[in-house]
């Protein structure tokens, strides 16, 4: 892999990107990562012992993933995304990066995200995906129906991005899925205090999952497809 830019804001704003304002502002884009970066990003992706999202730490990742995180949190990408979402100066907000390598069936219940988030971007890095809707990201019209889609579902394939402006009706989620599902999540937050609080909570969650991951997996195994929580 050469030193070329991994995430080019110009690609995000080309004609193939889907931008929607209703029922809330969101963006769907594919092909956002270069093909020649696949191998490095695969090798450099963090290896977590538990399932779910964990706070980004540079020491967990190899150089290409660290570079990608740096570019995703830099002003050019943030402001290009903010323009698409109707959020001027998105880069002015503090960022929180979390990374997921695998899920259990508890994850993906319908929710809006908390009010401490201004916007969220999910960048997928899976080189293939089964012929199933399980684990495919969905923007939704309502909180109680995973099948009431606001746009076509998004397979979490390499280079796909799903991003949205947080709102009281920014419902999203996916059908239960267990297994590897690589994704980097960038959240722009309302304050540094919220970033510190969420980071600390994420570290505690990582410890809990390391100690009690088997229980977490069993509790989520039978979750309802329309399971939801507000944030």
PLM features: residue spans?
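Non-heme Fe(II)/2-oxoglutarate
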Residues: 3-87
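Acidic, metal-ligating active-site segments
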Residues: 119-127
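Active-site rim elements
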Residues: 64-70, 107-108, 149-151, 171-172
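Short helix-loop capping/hinge motifs at secondary-structure junctions, enriched
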Residues: 35, 130-131
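Short, conserved, surface-exposed binding loops centered on an aromatic residue
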Residues: 91, 110-114, 129
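Catalytic core of Fe(II)/2-oxoglutarate
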Residues: 115, 133-231
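A short coil-to-beta-strand element that immediately follows conserved catalytic motifs
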Residues: 88-98, 133
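Conserved short histidine dyad/triad with adjacent acidic residue
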Residues: 99-113
């Amino acid at each position: 892999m050469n030193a070329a830019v991994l995430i080019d804001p110009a690609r995000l704003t080309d004609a193939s990107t889907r931008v929607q304002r209703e029922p809330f502002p969101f963006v769907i884009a594919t092909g956002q990562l270069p093909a020649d970066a696949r191998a490095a990003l695969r090798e450099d992706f963090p290896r977590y012992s538990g399932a779910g999202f964990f706070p980004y730490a540079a020491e967990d990742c190899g150089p290409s993933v660290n570079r990608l995180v740096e570019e995703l949190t830099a002003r050019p990408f943030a402001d290009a995304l903010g323009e698409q979402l109707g959020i001027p100066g998105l880069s002015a907000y503090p960022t929180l990066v979390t990374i997921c390598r695998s899920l259990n069936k508890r994850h993906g219940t319908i929710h809006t995200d908390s009010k401490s988030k201004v916007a969220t971007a999910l960048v997928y890095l899976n080189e293939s995906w089964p012929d199933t809707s399980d684990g495919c990201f969905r923007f939704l019209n309502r909180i109680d129906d995973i099948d009431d889609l606001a746009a076509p579902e998004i397979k979490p394939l390499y280079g796909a991005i799903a991003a949205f402006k947080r709102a009281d009706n920014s419902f999203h989620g996916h059908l239960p899925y267990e297994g590897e599902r690589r994704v980097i999540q960038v959240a722009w937050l309302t304050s540094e205090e919220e970033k510190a609080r969420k980071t600390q909570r994420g570290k505690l969650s990582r410890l809990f999952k390391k100690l009690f991951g088997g229980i977490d997996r069993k509790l989520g195994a039978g979750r309802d497809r329309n399971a939801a929580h507000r944030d």
